[in-house]
Structures are given as C-alpha cells and as structure tokens.
Amino acid sequence: MSIRERQDKFIENKVDIAISIHCNAGGGPLSSLGTSTYYRYNVYKSLTEDILGYLMQMEGVNNFGMVGNFNFSLSAITDFPCVLVETLFISSLAEEEKLADAQFRRAMMENVAKGLVDYIKECRVAEGQAKK
C-alpha cells in the first residue's frame, strides 16, 4: 500500500490519531542507541513528549531524542495528530537483542499506549477549559 493510499485509508476510516512505529537503523553499532519520537507540527509535540517520557522509564532504554518539524509522509496529514516512534536501533546488537524479546516489545508498546492515554486526557482537559 502506498503512502497516499494509507493516508486516504486513515481519512476514510476517520482515524483520530496515528502513531507510526518503527525500528531505527544506521550510525555506529555501538554509538547509535536509544528511542526517539518525531512530530511535524508543534501542536502534536505534547503527544511525542508523553510517549517518549514513558519510554524513558524503561530500564536500559536511552533517549535518542525528540525531533520537531520532521517531514515524513504520513505527518503531512493535518486532520489528526500523527507522530513517529523509532523504538530502538536494529543496527545495534544490544538493542536488537532487546527487540527480539517479546516481553520487551510488549512493554515498549504498553508505554506508548500510556503516553497516548495521557495525551488524550490532556486534550480533554484543554477542551473542557476551552468550553468555560
């Protein structure tokens, strides 16, 4: 499925939030470590902050950073928040071993979900304040 088809599918199905999850690669196998989050529009920065915050609570996970104004194809959609999560580097043997562990992957995704829940709560609070 092309990126455009994926975007159309999101819009057609009235997606509220899109989180694109990947493994990072590149750099030196010993120097490139950690998880990172990316957003294109500042209005979605808090979603990436919430997700990254929970991922940083995991033992042995380094912070590779949070990048704003990041231009990836899916983030071009402005109808709903869309962010990218790079879990760990598959080009690092130590991180590849972590990613091979199903329990570790599950814990990572549970932390992504916790960040999403926090973001939704923040949106509801902001929405309630806007109505006052």
List the predicted regions and their residue ranges.
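Active-site-proximal beta-strand/loop segments in catalytic clefts of secreted hydrolases
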Residues: 20-25, 40-42, 69-70, 86-93
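His/Asp/Glu-rich mid-to-C-terminal helical/loop segments that flank catalytic regions of hydrolases
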Residues: 93-132
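Extracytoplasmic/secreted cell-surface and envelope-processing proteins
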Residues: 1-4, 27-32, 49, 72-76, ...
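Extracytoplasmic/secreted envelope proteins and their assembly/folding machinery
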Residues: 3-7, 34-35, 45-52, 96, ...
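Sec-exported extracytoplasmic/periplasmic mature domains
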Residues: 11-15, 52-60, 104, 113, ...
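Active-site-adjacent substrate-binding region
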Residues: 41-68
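Catalytic-core regions of hydrolytic enzymes
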Residues: 1-46
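Short catalytic/ligand-gating loop segments at beta-alpha or beta-beta junctions
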Residues: 59-76, 127-132
